[in-house]
UniProtKB/Swiss-Prot annotation:
Transmembrane segments: none annotated. Residues 1-17 form the signal peptide. It comes from the Eukaryota. Keywords: Antibiotic, Antimicrobial, Cleavage on pair of basic residues, Immunity, Innate immunity, Signal. This is Hymenoptaecin. One of its GO terms (biological process) is defense response to bacterium. Residues 18-36 form a propeptide. This peptide has antibacterial activity.
């Protein structure tokens, strides 16, 4: 008797499982998650070189180029030093990643004393081994 009930239960489960596999809707699938928008980042960096005064940079960076291992970021923000008024600056960073190294560069413009613009350019690189 128990064996007959078990076989009957398995048969009902099998038939109901087959009925669930049949497609009820032929409507196309619409994804509910939207692609993320590219966003920038806020970077806070403090530096102190040798016996000079410390400085604090607060920047907003936005990635403007990113293909084949090359990147380009535009940024702008404030440079704060104790005892001096804060200075605005803007610049561009670029870089290229290689299999065993990298090369990066930076250009920046900042208002100097008297309101003049003072440019800054730099380049660096490295090898991994």
């Amino acid at each position: 008797m128990k064996f007959i009930v078990l076989v009957l239960f398995c048969a009902v489960a099998y038939v109901s499982a087959q009925a669930e596999l049949e497609p009820e809707d032929t409507m196309d699938y619409i994804p509910t998650r939207f692609r993320r928008q590219e966003r920038g980042s806020i970077v806070i960096q403090g530096t102190k070189e040798g016996k000079s005064r410390p400085s604090l940079d607060i920047d907003y960076k936005q990635r403007v180029y990113d293909k084949n291992g090359m990147t380009g970021d535009a940024y702008g923000g404030l440079n704060i030093r104790p005892g001096q008024p804060s200075r605005q600056h803007a610049g561009f960073e670029f870089g290229k990643e290689y299999k065993n190294g990298f090369i990066k560069g930076q250009s920046e413009v900042q208002r100097g004393p008297g309101g003049r613009l003072s440019p800054y350019f730099g380049i660096n690189g490295g090898f991994r081994f």
